[in-house]
Amino acid sequence: VYTYGNKRIGYLMYNHFASGPNEYDYSDTSYNLYLQQLFEKFKSRNVNEFVLDLRYNGGGLVNCAQLLASLLVRENVLGEPLCIMEYNDKNSNKNETLPLLKTTEVMAGNLNLQRLFVLTGSTTASASELIINSLRSYLDVRVIGKQTFGKTVGMTIYNESKKYGWILSPVTFHIYNKDREADYEDGFHPDVAIDEFKSDLAEFGDLKDPLLGQAIYEITGQSPLLRSATPRGNREIQYNPPLSYKDNLLLIPKD
């Protein structure tokens, strides 16, 4: 958390939408629980502005995006539609409107934000773009960084043949926000375009990071390098190895 006058700015680097260490073990929700607890800490510190770092996040589980979105939005829209998942005409019975979680489901972690700053890169995709597109129906979302990937569709995982060590994950549905908008096939163009690799790289959360620095400037009108703002608490960085794709198939290495 960074403090500038009455601005208490939360920052989260989120690199993959997974409910637990094994993305395909849906019974393990340890990551989701940790995320809820983290947002309770943000709320206890009176965070009223937020920077969400999705620059290296290529997507993941929609229900994890549902949780994150529900922790960020205004409290009075909890329970409203988040996104629409629409299948082809042969599977229209599977069409689903996914809601924002209810107040009781996000415990005490909802930040009740009026706006959100999202840091992006060229591999920001899928569930990350769902966050941007869906929250624009409820919040002022500012995008800082590079143009995103442009993945407006979702995939269904078929993992019945576990003994062979592979899964099938075809594209099966199109994703819209509640206003039926999904016009980002070419990715989201940033409101402020910045290529982080044109300057020295900094640690996540370091105010020398040009993307985070720009977000701080947008919020406060001050350059973070001209004024000291001390991050409160330890930064925690977790790594998920990249998944391999070939011809729209998700390839999972066998143990």
Where are these regions (language model features)?
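C-terminal "post-core" interaction segments
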Residues: 9-12, 16-26, 36-37, 41-49, ...
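Short strand-turn motif at the edge of the Rossmann-like AdoMet-binding core
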Residues: 55
